[in-house]
């Protein structure tokens, strides 16, 4: 007989493994989407020698460790990004379910987290958020709204609460102050989270982005241009899990 504590842990182990498998697919998206390549047609292969990978070369995290971070065929180094993204996605899934429980909303949040992780890496490297990912997030927003019909108005307002002011800023500055991808991201995730959460997410993103980028400018000489995607994603993710709690605590302090 399997001990009860172990039975309780097994679903989380399965969830983590599933998250790493999805993380493996995210790596494909991270490399191929910016290059305009198909994420489903071409088989996985070594980026150096082009050798097609066997299934045992693609076991999330473990294959990279077993191979010593090198291609089995040509021995070229394999970026540590692969196991890091796989493990990070698995941990994000555990975090979401650990805080939010096993429910439909958590399913939406896990898919959202994977999309945010993917676009963060791509935006950090290219200063562009792929429209495909924003469309995927918009579809999640529609699903989240359907699952939360009693708060339909909040979701609809959320889609415009930050994106419309950013769009006006985009027009006034002719795109110098904010990117179109950031606007679409806030519209899609505003639909997912509702207006209160998306406003808080944006405030957190601005604080985080300002602090970290100023630090990078001082320590590494980074330029003034920054990719907002990673910071917006961080604000969105944290607010999805803790936003309502923080908002209620703040209102309680105000006696409201």
Name these PLM-found stretches:
Residues 26-81:
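Membrane-proximal soluble regions of multi-pass membrane proteins
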Residues 106-210, 214, 249-256:
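Functional transmembrane core segments of multi-pass inner-membrane proteins
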Residues 8-16, 82, 86, 105, ...:
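Residue-level signature of transmembrane alpha-helical entry/exit and packing/kink sites
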Residues 96-108:
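Transmembrane helix-loop-helix
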Residues 215-238:
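Interfacial loop-to-transmembrane junctions
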Residues 1-34:
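Long, highly hydrophobic alpha-helical transmembrane signal-anchor segments
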